[in-house]
Amino acid sequence: LEAELAARDERRVRTSLKLSGLPSGHTLSNFDFAFQPSVERSRIETLATCAWIREKESLLIQGPPGVGKTHLAVALGVRAIENGFSVAFHRLEDLLAALKRDADVSPQRLRQRKHMNVALLIIDEVGFEPMTRSEASLFFRLVSYRYGRGSILITTNKGVAEWPAVLAGDEVL
């Protein structure tokens, strides 16, 4: 019985990883903490417990290019799947394209979209390119809808003070 349960869990994890869109190969065990001493291993290990996902809190990983933001985001996504959470990974550019396609979809059908109802939505590369006003509005609607319903993990190379420029120059968004 124990072997059967372990096999089922392994299949669930494997299937969930495929469905999530997470790039393969990024785990916490292969993240080079020595290369990036500014990343506190203890803080990442705390995040890896997934308590923040259980509480439907969100996370921002900010830093310059090449420091491992995406690696950490994906590794936390893998850990979330291992802990039974549903996960979807999108680069912002791809997510905005999906949101534009869904702009005229009824609210009931929109709720069925993966990016709306997973436990953890990972949005990579926010701020790589500035958003148009309509893109910023769609992004805000997504974040607003998910508030209190599910966690969002965002990676960005922009500090929070730079976000108005990313969000079509709108300080309110």
Task: Please place each PLM-identified region on the residue numbering.
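Interdomain "pre-motor" coupling segment immediately N-terminal to P-loop NTPase/helicase cores
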Residues: 1-24
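Conserved P-loop
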Residues: 39-117, 164-167
